[in-house]
Every structure is written in C-alpha cells, then in structure tokens.
C-alpha cells in the first residue's frame, strides 16, 4: 500500500518515544480496541501519536477537552503533516443560547446564536476530507458527539459535474438551490454562485480560497476550471468536480415531505395527550408553533429550529442515536482522546444536561416529544461507535485503565533528558512566609513561580499579600476568558510578572518552561482540587525546567499526596537511570513564547499560493494583533475583507492577494482565540 501520510519533522523519536510508538502500533495491528499512553508533561505525546498515524496510514480523529487545546493540537498536527488534510472541527457558535423554559417565572427564552462563518467552513472542510481522502487528521472538541447531518443524505445531495456531461443550465441552478447555495451576481462569497451567460461560477461552502467555473455549450459541460475568486485567475483545468451542500443539515425534498407527514401524525397524538390532561394552553402553543414550522418547511425546505425534527429528517426511530462526526469516520479509523481524564467525563455529562432542558420544553408544549432525539450521543452510544482508541494523558482515569486492562504504555523519559520536579512537603503553619522566601530566590535568577490555592478568596488575599511585599503577581480566575488567559500566561513567560496564582486553571496543556517552582498550598485538604490526578498534573507544570521543584504545604501526608509523590519519584528514577545509561545531559526547553498564538502562521504559509511578491506576515510584522480579543480579531477580519474587495474592484489584484494572505493568518489567530 502506498504511503499517504508524510510526517515532516527535523526530530527522530527519542527517550521513551520509540518504544511507545512500537507498542501502540503492535496493539493496533493486533486489534486491541483500547490502549492508554501515559505520557508525562514535555515527553512529546503529540509527536508519538503523529508517528503512529504516519506509520499505520489510517484516518484519525483527535478529541481534545476544549477549544484552546484543540487549537494547540491543530497547529502542531498542521506542522507535522503539511502535505496532508489536517482539519479542525469545533463548535461554530461564537455565542449560543439554547431555547429554554423556566416554569417558575413563566419565562420562555428563544434560541439565539451567532455562527462563526470561518469555523463553519472548516467543519464542512473536515467532513469533505473524511468522505474523500484517507490521509486525514481531524482535531475535534467534544462538539463531535453532537448531531450532524446524516452522511447518507449528505452524500445523496452532492452535485457531481464532469467534462462532457449533458446537463442544462437550469438543472444545475436548481440543484445548487437544493444544496442551499444562493445566487449573488454582485458579491461573490462562500456558499454563493453567479451566472454570466453560459458560465456559472460557484464558490464552494467548504473553501475559503478557490472557486469553480463551469462553462456550458449547447447543454453540455465544456470546461471545468478552478480559479482564484479574488483575482479571477484560472489556476487549473479539471476533468470533474463534486459540489458539497452548503450545510450539513441539507435534506432532499422528498425526505422533507415525508418528514412533514410524520410530524403531523405526532402532533395529532400529542395534542390528544395534552387535551386529555386538561393542558389547553400547552396544546394551543404546540399546535401553533408546529404548524408554523411545517409551513416554513413546505415553502423554504427548512425552518428555524429544524434540528428539533432531526429524527424524522434522518429517518431514525425513537431513541436512536443521532448521526455525528463519528459516522463520517471510516470503519478502520483511529480515535485519539487527548487529556482523556478530562475528556471522557465530559462526553458522559453532555447528554444529561441537554435532556433536562428539553424535557421541560416538551412538558410545557414548546416542542414535540421527538425533539428529545435531537441530542448529543449518550456515553454508551459513543462507546459503541468509537473505533480503535488511544487514550493519552499524564494521569489516566479509572475508565481508561479499566478499558485497556490495566496495561499502560509508559512515556516517561523525555527526549530532552529533563527530570520530573523534586517534590518536598512542608508544614502549613508557615506556608505563606516560606513561599515568599522561595519566590524571592526564583525571581533573583529570572525564573517564574506558579501557586495554586483552594478558593477565590485565598487567591485574592495571597495576591494582595505578595504584592504588598514587592512581588510582581497576577491572579488567574474563572472569569477570565480564553484569550486573556493565554495573554496572562505569555506575559508570565516574558517576565512582565513573576508569580501566577490560580485555583484550578493551572493544569492540562500549559507549556511554561520558565516556571521552576510550583507551590501547592493546603495540599493536605483531600478533595477534587487535591486529588492524586490534580496534584500530578499541577506538579507537572514545573517539569519543563532544569531546576523544577514542587512544594506541597501540608501538616499530614494524605493518600492522594502519597500516591502523587510516589508516582513523581517513580518517573524521576526511571528518567535518571535512562540519562545515566545513555550519557544524556538534561537540556532546558527553549520554546518560542508566541507559539500558541501563532497557530495560523504555518497554515497561512502552506495555503498561500506562490506569488511574485512578498505577502507581509501580520503576526511577525504587527505584534499588536496577537493581543486582540476574539471581538477585535473579528473586526479586523471584516476590515481586511472590505479592503480586499476594494482592491479587487479597482483591479489591483496583487494588493488584493496580499491582503488575502494576511486575512488567512488573522483568521487562524481567531481560531486560537475563540
């Protein structure tokens, strides 16, 4: 079989990586359904996974617990596989308020949502890649377990065009309208088409930098070409092309008509139940809302909140699992669950919260009972659909350990030779004064400190106390949004302040090589924030520094502390032994400080077409952009789009293309920020 994945890296597997790669690949080839990779902080887990993907040549989905880590993984995978389809699939809502009813105050809250067009385009691109290619890595958030259009209906709706095909212009335009494309002869943008004589230009919904030109002659497709929608320059002539629907939720007309009949039948049954229970108001409300939706579906082919009828539109039975991104993944696909100790419980919790809200809507006549089937997957359904799975975590949960039969693949030795931090336990009585003296020692040699406490009040008091004693301190709390949080972490690394105080925000996925001390106050207070996994994750924040040290303040050693200290010492001994055997001298990490915010640079460089000019890199030339909030970046995107269109109208195509290259980069920054 020809090799489709091409791994691009200047590094070769080192430390525990070669053994981990070998064992993972053997397990997958032997048909093991579940494997757990215990990879410590800084051991190159993503690189190990990338090697497994490249060697086994299988389409892969990587699940991350949140958008920040998904963006980070997407950036890393994009660098490892520049010539393959690395896709990004997260929730496309910038803002989402689901419809809800509060019976106590008789308040109905309408659904309100703001969709991010760029992320919608990336989601469409992800499903297209899974349907068309084998060399695909989709990095997804837990959004992947939510209902998506049925892949069978989606495939049925595609429009295939090929050179020499006999089809008249009206038939093409009718099919485009069914795919929910709109005609716009003035503003040519994603999801639209324009007609000029016998030429139809189509801007595919999943594309952001190319369009399709269909030239007809005497009811026959004479030529198909890919062109730059900005400059109009033809880039290639192609023999065939497939146009995908504008949305995942597109449905054939006959299916809509059939669904409408089924909805009417359910409405009659439900009205009878409500009237029998003397719920006249609910019966009237349900009848009015459903009739309005049916009218809209009949006239337009869709209605607001059409997802509530998804059971009928996809032809499923009551209680059946909704189609999701997993239905698009080939049968021999591979699933990698990153930070599995966080992601797995998240998957389990999604269904229950959604169900409680919908039951109230059904009970009070806002929705038909079939709306309960518009839901995320249940955990059991996820287990049934998941292909061969690799769980990746520094602290695997009980579920992962049980599923992989207690067999854990250790990736403890880092390629850099860095050791896990030294762990000390000190008494609580003098913890604040002791911490102050430790901070001063670190500040004197230009190193940083993380401090984790139990409550918001303690964090505020400690921040105030340390500030009064002349230390440069910031406090990270739950009210701070993702972008500001990333900026605070970057400022800490840059040395704008020396100490960061937090509660539960100093855990997974934060790379800060400058941090040499992690202080855990009140470590002996057994609970979620001081569990074995939380302690190991927090101690791991100092594992990227040559002088890494963790101080646990506690008057007694709890079972969680004992296990966390024992595990850290086990890892440290293994790392030391490996270094001695191979004559390795530990090297400090020298990671670029702007890494997480430069998500889009590699992508923009890959996507930008070779031109006879130097497209200015916004990220490199204008650091102000890195500080922008999602709102600021969105505004900048609109400004650049307007600027680009203006250049195109003035026939200044080189300048327009230059602005377009900048636009790519700002969009990718926006993904990291959103």
From Swiss-Prot:
- Zinc-finger as a keyword of this entry, yes or no, is no
User: Keyword annotations for this protein?
Assistant: ATP-binding, Cytoplasm, DNA damage, DNA excision, DNA repair, Excision nuclease, Helicase, Hydrolase, Nucleotide-binding, SOS response
One Pfam entry for this protein is: Helicase_C
Coiled-coil segments: none
User: GO CC annotations?
Assistant: cytoplasm; excinuclease repair complex
Cross-referenced InterPro entries: Helicase/UvrB_N, Helicase_ATP-bd, Helicase_C-like, P-loop_NTPase, UVR_dom, UVR_dom_sf, UvrB, UvrB_inter
Limits of the UVR domain: 634-669
UniProt xrefs under Gene3D superfamilies = P-loop containing nucleotide triphosphate hydrolases, UVR domain
Q: Where is this motif: Beta-hairpin?
A: 92-115
Q: Name one GO molecular function term.
A: DNA binding
Q: Which residues bind ATP?
A: 39-46
Instruction: Report the residue ranges that make up the Helicase ATP-binding domain in this protein.
Output: 26-183
Q: Name one GO biological process term.
A: SOS response
Residue stretches making up the Helicase C-terminal domain: 431-597
State the compartments where it is located.
Cytoplasm
Q: Does the keyword GTP-binding apply?
A: no
The record ties this protein, via NCBIfam families, to: PRK05298.1, uvrb
In the record, the note on similarity to other proteins reads: Belongs to the UvrB family.
The record's domain comment reads:
The beta-hairpin motif is involved in DNA binding.
**Function per UniProt:** The UvrABC repair system catalyzes the recognition and processing of DNA lesions. A damage recognition complex composed of 2 UvrA and 2 UvrB subunits scans DNA for abnormalities. Upon binding of the UvrA(2)B(2) complex to a putative damaged site, the DNA wraps around one UvrB monomer. DNA wrap is dependent on ATP binding by UvrB and probably causes local melting of the DNA helix, facilitating insertion of UvrB beta-hairpin between the DNA strands. Then UvrB probes one DNA strand for the presence of a lesion.
Q: How does it assemble?
A: Forms a heterotetramer with UvrA during the search for lesions. Interacts with UvrC in an incision complex.
Protein's name according to its UniProt entry:
UvrABC system protein B
Native source species:
Erwinia tasmaniensis (strain DSM 17950 / CFBP 7177 / CIP 109463 / NCPPB 4357 / Et1/99)
Gene this protein is translated from: uvrB
């Amino acid at each position: 079989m020809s090799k489709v994945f091409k791994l691009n890296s200047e590094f070769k597997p080192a430390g525990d990586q070669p053994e981990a790669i070998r064992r993972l690949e053997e397990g997958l080839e032997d048909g093991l359904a579940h494997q757990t990779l215990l990879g410590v902080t800084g051991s190159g887990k993503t690189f190990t996974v990338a090697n497994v993907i490249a060697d086994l040549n299988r389409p892969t989905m990587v699940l991350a617990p949140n958008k920040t880590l998904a963006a980070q993984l997407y950036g890393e995978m994009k660098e490892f596989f520049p010539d393959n389809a690395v896709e990004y699939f997260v929730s496309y809502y910038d803002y989402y308020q689901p419809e809800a009813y509060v019976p106590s105050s008789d308040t109905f809250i309408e659904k309100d949502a703001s969709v991010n067009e760029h992320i919608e385009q990336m989601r469409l691109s992800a499903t297209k890649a899974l349907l068309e290619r084998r060399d695909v890595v989709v990095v997804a958030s837990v959004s992947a377990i939510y209902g998506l259009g049925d892949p069978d209906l989606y495939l049925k709706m595609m429009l295939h065009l090929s050179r020499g095909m006999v089809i008249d212009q009206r038939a093409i335009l009718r099919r485009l309208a069914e795919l929910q494309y709109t005609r716009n002869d003035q503003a040519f943008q994603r999801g639209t088409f324009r007609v000029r004589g016998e030429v139809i230009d189509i801007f595919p919904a999943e594309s952001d930098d190319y369009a399709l030109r269909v030239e007809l002659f005497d009811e026959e497709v004479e030529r198909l070409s890919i062109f730059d929608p900005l400059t109009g320059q033809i880039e290639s002539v192609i023999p065939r092309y497939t146009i995908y629907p504008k949305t995942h939720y597109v449905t054939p007309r006959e299916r809509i008509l059939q669904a409408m009949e089924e909805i009417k039948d359910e409405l009659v049954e439900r009205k009878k139940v409500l009237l029998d229970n003397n719920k006249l108001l609910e019966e009237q409300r349900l009848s009015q809302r459903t009739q309005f939706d049916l009218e809209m579906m009949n006239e337009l082919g869709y209605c607001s909140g059409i997802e509530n009828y998804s059971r009928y539109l996809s032809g499923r039975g009551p209680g059946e699992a909704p189609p999701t991104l997993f239905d698009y993944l080939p049968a021999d696909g591979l699933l990698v669950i990153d930070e599995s100790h966080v992601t797995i419980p998240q998957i389990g919790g999604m269904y229950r919260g959604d169900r409680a809200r919908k039951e109230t809507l059904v009970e009070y006549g806002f929705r038909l009972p079939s709306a309960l089937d518009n839901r995320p997957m249940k955990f059991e359904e996820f287990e049934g659909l998941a292909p061969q799975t690799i769980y990746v975590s520094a602290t695997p949960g009980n579920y992962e350990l049980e599923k992989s039969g207690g067999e854990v693949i250790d990736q403890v030795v880092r390629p850099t030779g860095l050791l896990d931090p030294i762990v000390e336990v000190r008494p609580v009585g003098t913890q604040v004064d002791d911490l102050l003296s430790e901070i001063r020692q670190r500040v004197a040699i230009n190193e940083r400190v993380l401090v984790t406490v139990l409550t918001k009040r303690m964090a505020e008091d400690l921040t105030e106390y340390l500030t009064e004693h002349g230390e440069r301190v910031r406090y990270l709390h739950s009210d701070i949004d993702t972008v500001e949080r990333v900026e605070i972490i970057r400022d800490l690394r840059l040395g704008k302040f020396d100490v960061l105080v937090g509660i539960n925000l100093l855990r997974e996925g934060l790379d800060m090589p400058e941090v040499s001390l992690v202080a855990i106050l009140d470590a002996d207070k057994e609970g979620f924030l001081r569990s074995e996994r939380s302690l190991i994750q927090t101690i791991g924040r100092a594992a990227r520094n040559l002088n890494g040290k963790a101080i646990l303040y506690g008057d007694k050693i709890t079972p969680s502390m004992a296990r966390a200290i024992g595990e850290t010492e086990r890892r440290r001994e293994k790392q030391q032994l490996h270094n001695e055997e191979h004559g390795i001298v530990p090297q400090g990490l020298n990671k670029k400080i702007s890494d997480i915010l430069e998500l889009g640079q590699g992508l923009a460089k890959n996507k930008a077409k070779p031109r006879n000019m130097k497209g200015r890199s916004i990220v490199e030339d204008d650091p102000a952009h890195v500080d922008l909030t999602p709102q600021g970046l969105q505004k900048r995107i609109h400004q650049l789009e307007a600027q680009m269109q203006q250049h195109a109208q003035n026939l200044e195509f080189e300048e327009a293309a230059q602005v377009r290259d900048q636009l790519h980069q700002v969009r990718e920054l926006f993904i990291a920020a959103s």
